[in-house]
Curated annotation (Swiss-Prot):
Entry GO MF terms: ATP binding; non-membrane spanning protein tyrosine kinase activity; protein tyrosine kinase activity; signaling receptor binding
Phosphoprotein keyword on record: yes
Keyword Oxidoreductase: no
Keywords: ATP-binding, Cytoplasm, Kinase, Nucleotide-binding, Phosphoprotein, SH2 domain, SH3 domain, Transferase, Tyrosine-protein kinase
Lineage: Eukaryota, Metazoa, Chordata, Craniata, Vertebrata
Catalytic activity: L-tyrosyl-[protein] + ATP = O-phospho-L-tyrosyl-[protein] + ADP + H(+)
Tissue expression profile of the protein: Highly expressed in most breast cancers (at protein level).
Effect noted on mutating Y380F: Significant reduction in phosphorylation
Binding site for ATP: L236, G237, E238, G239, Y240, F241, G242, E243, V244, K258
A single BP term in Gene Ontology: positive regulation of TORC1 signaling
Gene it is expressed from: SRMS
Protein name: Tyrosine-protein kinase Srms
Functional summary from the UniProt entry: Non-receptor tyrosine-protein kinase which phosphorylates DOK1 on tyrosine residues. Also phosphorylates KHDRBS1/SAM68 and VIM on tyrosine residues. Phosphorylation of KHDRBS1 is EGF-dependent. Phosphorylates OTUB1, promoting deubiquitination of RPTOR.
UniProt domain Protein kinase: residue ranges: 230-488
Length: 488
């Protein structure tokens, strides 16, 4: 065995001399040992394939089959001195130090990130940054860290706080992969090196008391995403707040993207309103996915409802073919969503069929809750534009801007009228001014032909002049469900 290995792997003569010193007995083989006549022996190139030594990590257990191989266990750290022929010649850094050949299929290169689970290792930190960290609260004298060396590729440095200054020590690597601060004191790894100098700190004149505490990074809002993650596709519509587009998130997830019109919005209040939206969770509310508010235009990204808004859907052939049960189903679902907002003390301010979205299976969800509060005062005014939703707005809100859950109840009554007229515009033929005048004189929308009498009674209750006399959404929800059960 010895002559064969010395002849085939002559460049490892220093290693063979350790195994078979001069005058030693030759190895005539042991039971189960590698037979050079029957088993292939790796042939390593004369020149290394890459700069060595390199760090490897054992992926699987391997049991040596001859004296030239190295037994390793999964997780062992290895320092590879040579590589080739499907093997590495490596020194084990953990456990009992020894060296030998290990199949390359059983190991993987270990980058410095392998140390990232250690509290004292700071990847990507420069010498200057290490000083800033160690001298910043809550760190005190004795705080230390290991970082990649700036002057030695693949090497490390030890930085230690000593009162009001920071001392830096180069961690050198010996030819066999051992690490040291001082020649003559070799360690198989960084952990062993630190353990030694914690106990013998006087050798470097600075105690190693505790790992450096990283400064807390600013808390990142997981909802906030860059514009680059979203691609606009088909334009779905346009409203008071901006345009609505069908789009893709990260190239795969279909979403609805509301592009906010900054000219009409009080963007200074947008962050606060979005915080409210993030905390609302109900199956009858449109689900918020993400926000892009780091620059203009602002995106509000929500789930995509395939059939669009309820007002437009009711005017399609599919919508006009619906009979009483699904229409009552729409009313019940909207009442459920609004009852939840009522419990959360959130005022919608712009409840209408156009702000209810429909998906496959005729599931519907309330959208745009709370955004009307962000419209600039000169935009949200009954006299400013015929586009403003005065016909859906309670008189106290239209005249005096007094919004409440009860003004939402008024709007819900108008939404019910839309549902049972298959999306027709309420107060058709009247201007905003005429509508308000007629309402103040006591006029109320007539009962639609498709509307049950008991539902129309609820509409009239929603349109009571005194807000306090209007029903709650919880009451409306229960009454509508009872009516729905009578019309299965």
């Amino acid at each position: 065995m010895e002559p064969f290995l010395r002849r085939r792997l002559a460049f490892l003569s220093f290693f063979w001399d350790k195994i078979w010193p001069a005058g030693g007995e030759p190895d005539h083989g042991t039971p189960g040992s590698l037979d050079p006549n029957t088993d292939p022996v790796p042939t390593l190139p004369a020149e290394p394939c890459s700069p060595f030594p390199q760090l490897f990590l054992a992926l699987y257990d391997f049991t040596a089959r001859c004296g030239g191989e190295l037994s390793v266990r999964r997780g062992d750290r290895l320092c590879a001195l040579e590589e080739g022929g499907g093997y590495i010649f490596a020194r084990r850094l953990s456990g009992q130090p020894s060296a030998g050949l290990v199949p390359i299929t059983h190991v993987a290169k270990a980058s410095p990130e392998t140390l990232s689970d250690q509290p004292w290792y700071f990847s990507g930190v420069s010498r200057t940054q290490a000083q800033q960290l160690l001298l910043s609260p809550p760190n005190e004298p004795g705080a230390f860290l290991i970082r990649p060396s700036e002057s030695s590729l693949g090497g490390y440095s030890l930085s230690v706080r000593a009162q009001a200054k920071v001392c830096h020590y180069r961690v050198s690597m010996a030819a066999d992969g051992s690490l040291y601060l001082q020649k003559g004191r070799l360690f198989p790894g960084l952990e062993e090196l630190l353990t030694y100098y914690k106990a013998n700190w006087k050798l470097i004149q600075n105690p190693l008391l505790q790992p450096c505490m990283p400064q807390k990074a600013p808390r990142q809002d997981v909802w906030e995403r860059p514009h680059s993650e979203f691609a606009l596709g088909r334009k779905l519509g346009e409203g008071y707040f901006g345009e609505v587009w069908e789009g893709l998130w990260l190239g795969s997830l279909p979403v609805a993207i509301k592009v906010i019109k900054s000219a009409n919005m009080k963007l200074t209040d947008l962050a606060k309103e979005i915080q409210t939206l993030k905390g609302l969770r109900h199956e009858r509310l449109i689900r918020l996915h993400a926000v892009c508010s780091g620059g203009e235009p602002v995106y509000i990204v929500t789930e995509l409802m395939r059939k669009g808004n309820l007002q437009a859907f009711l005017g399609t052939p599919e919508g006009r073919a619906l009979r009483l049960p699904p229409l009552l189903g729409f009313a019940c679902q909207v009442a459920e969503g609004m009852s939840y907002l009522e419990e959360q003390r959130v005022v919608h301010r712009d409840l209408a069929a156009r702000n209810v979205l429909v998906d496959d299976g005729l599931a519907c969800k309330v959208a745009d809750f709370g955004l009307a509060r962000l419209l600039k005062d000169d935009i949200y005014s009954p006299s400013s534009s015929s586009k403003i939703p005065v016909k859906w707005t309670a008189p106290e809100a239209a005249n005096y801007r007094v919004f409440s859950q009860k003004s939402d109840v008024w709007s819900f009554g108008v939404l019910l009228h839309e549902v049972f007229t298959y999306g027709q515009c309420p107060y058709e033929g009247m201007t905003n001014h005429e509508t308000l005048q007629q309402i103040m004189r006591g006029y109320r929308l007539p009962r639609p032909a498709a509307c049950p009498a008991e539902v129309y009674v609820l509409m009239l209750e929603c349109w009571r002049s005194s807000p306090e006399e209007r029903p709650s959404f919880a009451t409306l929800r229960e009454k509508l469900h009872a009516i729905h059960r009578c019309h299965p």
